[in-house]
Design a protein with these regions (language model features):
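Long, low-complexity segments enriched in small/aliphatic residues
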Residues: 1-43
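Long, contiguous, secondary-structure-rich segments that constitute the structural scaffold
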Residues: 18, 34, 39-54, 58-133
Length: 133
């Protein structure tokens, strides 16, 4: 193989005044992929049974909620409510959410625009606003 240079392209949707934060979706240790297998395991589901999002403590304070309280996450496509947890590992201005919880389905919020070459949806990055629930 060989390396081929590419030019980075911006995300289909960037933060703005109305939706000033970034939603990042991903996996958590206890629940792999969409949780279809791991959420059936009573032991694993007991470790992380409820939907949650991770936010930097400064962002939680700016929104006016404490770790463990509920927030509403809203994008141009949808709105869900879930617990917010303080996480200094999440960059300020970003919100991390696992996509394994059907009760608060992350893809109700995500950007469906397809990459022009790979035809992969842009599920990992979209503009978001957070409010107390």
């Amino acid at each position: 193989g060989r390396f081929v240079p590419v030019s980075p392209t911006p995300a289909a949707e960037l933060p703005d005044a109305e939706f000033p934060m970034v939603l990042i979706t991903g996996r958590v240790l206890e629940h792999w992929h969409t949780g279809t297998m791991t959420r059936r395991s009573f032991v694993l589901d007991a470790l992380d049974p409820e939907p949650w999002c991770g936010m930097h403590p400064d962002d939680l304070a700016r929104v006016g909620v404490a770790s463990g309280e509920r927030v509403a996450l809203e994008t141009r496509r949808g709105r869900i409510k879930l617990e917010a947890r303080a996480d200094e590992g999440v960059a300020p201005g970003s919100v991390f959410m696992a996509f394994c919880y059907h009760e608060a389905a992350a893809n109700l919020l995500t950007q469906p625009k397809l990459d022009p070459f790979g035809k992969i949806p842009e599920f990992k990055f979209c503009a978001l606003r957070v409010e107390p629930a």
